[in-house]
């Protein structure tokens, strides 16, 4: 049985993850962590997730929760995820990170922790989205430079980072498939008199509002036709399901940074 610690266990994603982990054969919730001062401290993680008691009380001490654990699932913030990665490295516990908004410095710190333990770091744990990454890769390769690539994403009004990590990754995938450097190709939310669109550019537009779980569309705009690849999330459950799948896959792997393409066996599509 793989023992799983869930951080942010009382949040919207954390409660979904607790439910999915307890429903996944071979996985068990062994620990639940929240920030210091959270009203969830001391409460049963299973009850907070809307189910039967698990006998696992939420605590604010990750180091203590890691004792005897095999893997941590972390959907908190990129700042907290860096601290959690460092704690996991010190304890020798694998880590699945679904947080977004990572700066280059934060990613470097996660990579440093991954020299000691295996880490899955993915901007989107949804199986469907990771299939979309591969579809975009193939479409960009086949359609080539004759099609302009644009990306539009929309999320709920509470999402703090923009654009979404998924939108950025979609742009990176398209750029790499077209032989372009993402740092040069990606353009975010245009404004003003900019002149004609550069042919090498990949635009990313961000919308926020309501309770939209997440929607991403990649447009390949050619002369006389347009190809659209869209993923719509209607529930956070698919993110939790993907995270549980990653948690079952990761323990025992060599140290290093992995993503959902590794978990799903999609590397052959590169």
UniProtKB/Swiss-Prot annotation:
UniProt-listed Pfam families: DapB_C (PF05173), DapB_N (PF01113)
Chain residues that bind (S)-2,3,4,5-tetrahydrodipicolinate: 156, 165-166
PROSITE patterns cross-referenced by the UniProt entry: DAPB
Pathway it works in: Amino-acid biosynthesis; L-lysine biosynthesis via DAP pathway; (S)-tetrahydrodipicolinate from L-aspartate: step 4/4
Residues annotated as the enzyme's active site: 155 (proton donor/acceptor), 159 (proton donor)
Enzyme class: oxidoreductase
EC number: 1.17.1.8
Cytoplasm in keyword set: yes
Classification via InterPro entries: DapB_C, DapB_N, DapB_N_CS, DHDPR_bac, NAD(P)-bd_dom_sf
Protein name: 4-hydroxy-tetrahydrodipicolinate reductase
Organism of provenance: Anaeromyxobacter sp. (strain K)
């Amino acid at each position: 049985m793989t023992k799983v610690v869930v951080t942010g266990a009382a949040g919207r994603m954390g409660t979904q993850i607790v439910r999915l982990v307890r429903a996944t054969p071979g996985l068990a919730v062994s620990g639940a962590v929240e920030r210091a001062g959270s009203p969830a401290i001391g409460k049963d993680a299973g009850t907070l997730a809307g189910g039967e008691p698990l006998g696992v009380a939420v605590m604010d001490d990750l180091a203590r929760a890691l004792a005897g654990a095999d893997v941590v699932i972390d959907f908190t913030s990129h700042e907290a995820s860096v601290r959690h990665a460092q704690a996991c490295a010190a304890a020798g516990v694998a880590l699945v990170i679904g947080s977004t908004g990572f700066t280059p410095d934060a990613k470097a710190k996660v990579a440093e922790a991954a020299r000691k333990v295996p880490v899955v770091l993915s901007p989107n744990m949804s199986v469907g989205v990771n299939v979309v990454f591969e579809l975009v890769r193939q479409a960009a390769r086949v359609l080539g430079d004759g099609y302009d690539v644009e990306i539009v994403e929309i999320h709920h009004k509470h999402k703090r980072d923009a654009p979404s990590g998924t939108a950025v990754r979609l742009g990176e995938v398209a750029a790499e498939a077209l032989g372009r450097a993402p740092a040069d190709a990606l353009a975010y939310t245009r404004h003003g008199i900019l002149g004609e669109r550069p042919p090498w550019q990949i635009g990313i537009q961000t919308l926020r509002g309501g309770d939209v779980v997440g929607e991403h569309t990649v447009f390949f705009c050619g002369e006389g036709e347009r190809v659209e690849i869209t993923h719509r999330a209607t529930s956070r459950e698919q993110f939790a399901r993907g995270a549980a799948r990653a948690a079952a896959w990761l323990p025992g792997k060599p140290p290093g940074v992995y993503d959902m393409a590794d978990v799903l066996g999609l590397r052959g599509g590169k």
